[in-house]
């Protein structure tokens, strides 16, 4: 499964995979409370003027369920990423610029859920980013996933591009204690 930096804006999701796994669905709703604290559920409504179905979010804040596309990009991106994890079970998930559209206040819980669920569902995930803040949140969101992480940075050495590989713990140490900027 591949997720581009703007895929959340295109409305293409993997929610059917989520709706078939009640435990993960409930966990996902819990994380989505960082985006809308009043969220109750997400469901598929196949009755639409265009003949196509839409995903709707029921929230205590609104009198009726609203289409996901009226929510902010952060909510859409979080739903996309979490549903993609489940759709990629026993496979590979590629996420380019994983942090786009996600507010920094919601990153920790969202990233923790993604990493821990990838581990549980046997999903190998590759993420790219240029955001120091997002990389820091990713590294520090789940202690139990640190040893499973590998972080690669590129740098110049004698007019050539070299690669540095570190596990999650070494990356945090390099960043916090040696001032290495990881992005």
Please provide the spans of the model-predicted regions:
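H-loop/switch region of ABC-family ATPase nucleotide-binding domains
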Residues: 128-130
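Short regulatory helix/loop adjacent to the ATP-binding pocket of P-loop NTPases
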Residues: 135-146
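ABC ATPase nucleotide-binding domain "signature" loop
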Residues: 100-104
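Loop/turn-to-beta-strand initiation segments
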Residues: 89-91, 122-126
């Amino acid at each position: 499964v591949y997720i581009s930096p703007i895929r959340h804006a295109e409305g293409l999701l993997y929610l059917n995979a989520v709706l078939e796994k009640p435990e993960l669905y409930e966990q996902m709703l819990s994380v989505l409370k960082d985006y809308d604290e009043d969220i109750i559920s997400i469901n598929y409504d196949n009755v639409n003027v265009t003949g196509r179905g839409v995903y709707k979010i029921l929230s205590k804040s609104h009198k009726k369920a609203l289409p996901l596309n009226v929510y902010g990009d952060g909510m859409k991106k979080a739903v996309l990423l979490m549903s993609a994890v489940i759709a990629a079970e026993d496979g590979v998930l590629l996420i380019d610029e994983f942090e786009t559209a996600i507010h920094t206040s919601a990153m920790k819980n969202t990233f923790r859920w993604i990493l821990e669920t990838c581990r549980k569902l046997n999903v190998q995930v590759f993420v790219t980013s240029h955001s120091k803040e997002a990389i820091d949140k990713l590294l520090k969101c789940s202690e139990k996933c640190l040893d499973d992480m590998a972080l690669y940075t590129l740098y110049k050495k004698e007019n050539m591009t070299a690669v540095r590989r570190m596990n999650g713990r070494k990356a945090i140490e390099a960043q916090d204690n040696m001032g290495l900027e990881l992005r």
